[in-house]
UniProtKB/Swiss-Prot annotation:
Family to which this protein belongs: Belongs to the glycosyl hydrolase 19 family. Chitinase class I subfamily.
Domain of life: Eukaryota
SUPFAM superfamilies in the record: Lysozyme-like (SSF53955)
EC class: hydrolase
Protein name: Endochitinase 3
One annotated GO biological process: cell wall macromolecule catabolic process
Reaction it catalyzes: Random endo-hydrolysis of N-acetyl-beta-D-glucosaminide (1->4)-beta-linkages in chitin and chitodextrins
Keywords: Carbohydrate metabolism, Chitin degradation, Chitin-binding, Glycosidase, Hydrolase, Plant defense, Polysaccharide degradation
């Protein structure tokens, strides 16, 4: 539920409090399920 390292809070993404930066948009990261999947599975979480 809290940001870790360079990953935003999944709660903030779900509730719309996170907005992608220009670098995020250029890399194809926009609010939605894909970003949440990357937050949860993008590191050593699973």
């Amino acid at each position: 539920m809290t940001p870790q390292g360079n990953k935003p809070s999944s709660h903030d993404v779900i509730t719309g409090r996170w907005t992608p930066s220009d670098a995020d948009r250029a890399a194809g990261r926009v609010s939605g399920f894909g970003v949440i999947t990357n937050i949860i599975n993008g590191g050593l979480d699973c």
